[in-house]
């Protein structure tokens, strides 16, 4: 993939990372992302800084946090530990995951689960 112009480039970058789930690789770096999608590191950095107002790690970890949230919402994952879901989502450190989750979501993963479970219960009781 090559970005021909600057218009729409942020959306294209987001789409590539999202659809290919490149963020699941805990070893993902700017260099490996660049090689995977065929855009120079310099151009990716420009897009992230100027268009999305994020640095590389914030950008990638945002996808990882959303992945964890989706996994937490899946009843089929209820038996799994939160940290297992975090590792499956590309995190490689419990401390980093907890810090970033709280920073992005505004509460700890455990508090989020309680809130999510409560919302699910309220919704299911509404439809009974």
Show where each model-derived region lies:
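Key DNA-contact positions within bacterial/archaeal DNA-binding proteins
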Residues: 42, 94-95, 110
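Terminal helix-turn-helix DNA-binding modules in bacterial transcription factors
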Residues: 51-88, 115-128
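Alpha-helical residues within the helix-turn-helix
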Residues: 35, 46, 50, 87-88, ...
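A secondary-structure capping/hinge motif
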Residues: 51-54, 100-112
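Central "turn" residue of the DNA-binding helix-turn-helix
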Residues: 38, 90-91
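Basic, amphipathic alpha-helical hairpins
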Residues: 14-28, 48, 52, 69-80, ...
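Short, Lys/Arg-enriched, Trp-marked, Pro/Gly-tolerant hinge/linker segments that flank
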Residues: 1-11, 50, 54-58
């Amino acid at each position: 993939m090559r970005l021909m112009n600057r218009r729409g480039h942020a959306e294209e970058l987001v789409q590539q990372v999202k659809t290919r789930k490149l963020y699941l690789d805990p070893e993902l770096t700017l260099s490996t992302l660049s090689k995977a999608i065929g855009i120079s590191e310099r151009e990716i950095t420009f897009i992230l800084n100027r268009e999305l107002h994020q640095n590389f790690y914030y950008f990638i970890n945002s996808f990882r946090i959303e992945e964890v949230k989706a996994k937490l919402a899946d009843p089929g994952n209820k038996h799994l530990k939160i940290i297992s879901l975090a590792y499956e989502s590309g995190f490689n450190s419990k401390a980093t995951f907890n810090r970033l989750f709280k920073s992005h979501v505004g509460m700890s993963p455990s508090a989020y689960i309680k809130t999510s479970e409560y919302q699910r219960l309220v919704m299911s009781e509404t439809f009974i």
